[in-house]
């Protein structure tokens, strides 16, 4: 069985002067519960891309690539976690196993990990991380003769600084969603078993995540990142424009499969827009609104880039 080692993406070319070259590597991230899966499915419907089936995470999680490169995690410890956690781990909330094992054969994992350790021992941690990523995931693209790969681990934009250094050919999409809906969704997902447990905690959690992401965008350079509002993508008069700008950022011509998925499947009823109003008692709506407005004010004062998108959605809903 081929291991897929030592294969890398090669940027494509286009003759369209108004269209960027297609990126061979597209990272899509957000706060969590923000719509990254929706955006990745839209763009993953294009013939350019193969979408990684689920979050790979080894390049973004604590103990992953950023910590290896910063010297906070040893290559040996990283390799242990890769083999024993990121490749396959049990998720109690879903009563199922998750991880790379669904699409990375054990033989490929072992060969790629051994090669990673050899490169680290040779004093090349950056090259080791970069090649490990391609060794594990690029075969997904070659299996379907695709020229590019989409990866949607939640923290890819928050960790855009080190990832942009490792992958200079990559671009990033930050998916933004109304913070009240994100907070309500996250609280519902936690089911009182973990933080955040209340709407107030949910908004605090969301603000912290947004700030981490903005720091990642600054580290990578704003020209490498496109911010897209899920709320604009599913409803309103900016829907088509939002889709077009996102497509152009990735360097994609329109295709029937991608446009068809967008027009048929990406709708407001599927996005659970304003779900917070049904999740939160009516008597608490004014308090939640006030807290959210205060957060947006703080983010504006600190120059956080996505606030314009968030305010536009809020103003449209308040009108």
Summary of predicted features, one role per range:
Residues 30-31:
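P-loop (Walker A) phosphate-binding loop of NTP-binding proteins
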Residues 50-53, 226:
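Conserved catalytic segments around the Walker B and adjacent sensor/switch elements
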Residues 116-131, 136-257, 274, 278-279:
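PAPS-dependent sulfotransferase catalytic domain
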Residues 55-149:
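PAPS-dependent sulfation machinery
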Residues 1-27, 187-190, 214-223, 227, ...:
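PAPS-dependent sulfotransferases, especially Golgi type II membrane carbohydrate sulfotransferases
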Residues 52-55, 258:
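Catalytic beta-strand/loop signature of glycosyltransferases that borders the donor
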Residues 78-97, 101-106, 157-163, 197-211, ...:
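Anion-recognition interface
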Residues 37-49:
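A conserved segment at the C-terminal end of the G1
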């Amino acid at each position: 069985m081929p291991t897929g080692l030592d294969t890398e993406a090669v940027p494509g070319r286009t003759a369209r002067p108004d269209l960027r070259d297609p990126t061979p590597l597209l990272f899509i991230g957000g706060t969590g519960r923000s719509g990254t899966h929706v955006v990745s499915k839209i763009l993953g419907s294009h013939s350019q891309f193969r979408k990684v089936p689920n979050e790979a995470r080894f390049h973004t999680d604590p103990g992953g690539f950023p910590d290896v490169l910063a010297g906070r995690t040893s290559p040996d410890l990283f390799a242990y976690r890769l083999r024993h956690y990121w490749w396959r781990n049990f998720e109690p909330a879903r009563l199922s196993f998750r991880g790379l094992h669904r699409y990375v054969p054990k033989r490929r994992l072992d060969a790629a990990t051994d090669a990673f350790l050899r490169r680290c021992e040779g004093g090349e941690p950056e090259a080791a991380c970069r090649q490990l990523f391609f060794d594990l995931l690029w075969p997904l693209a070659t299996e379907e003769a695709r020229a590019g790969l989409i990866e949607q681990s939640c923290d890819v934009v928050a960790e855009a600084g080190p990832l942009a250094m490792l992958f200079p050919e990559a671009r990033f999409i930050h998916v933004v969603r109304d913070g009240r809906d994100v907070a309500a969704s996250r609280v519902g997902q936690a089911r009182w078993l973990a933080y955040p447990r209340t709407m107030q905690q949910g908004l605090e959690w969301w603000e912290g995540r947004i700030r981490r992401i903005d720091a990642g965008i600054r580290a990578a350079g704003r020209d490498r990142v496109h911010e897209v509002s899920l709320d604009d993508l599913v409803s309103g008069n900016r829907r088509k424009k939002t889709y077009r700008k996102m497509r152009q950022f990735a360097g994609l011509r329109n295709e029937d499969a991608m446009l068809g998925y967008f027009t048929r499947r990406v709708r407001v009823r599927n996005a659970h827009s304003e779900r917070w109003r049904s999740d939160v008692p009516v008597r608490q709506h004014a308090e939640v609104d006030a807290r959210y407005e205060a957060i947006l004010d703080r983010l504006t004062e600190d120059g956080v880039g996505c606030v314009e998108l968030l305010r536009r959605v809020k103003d449209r809903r308040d009108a």
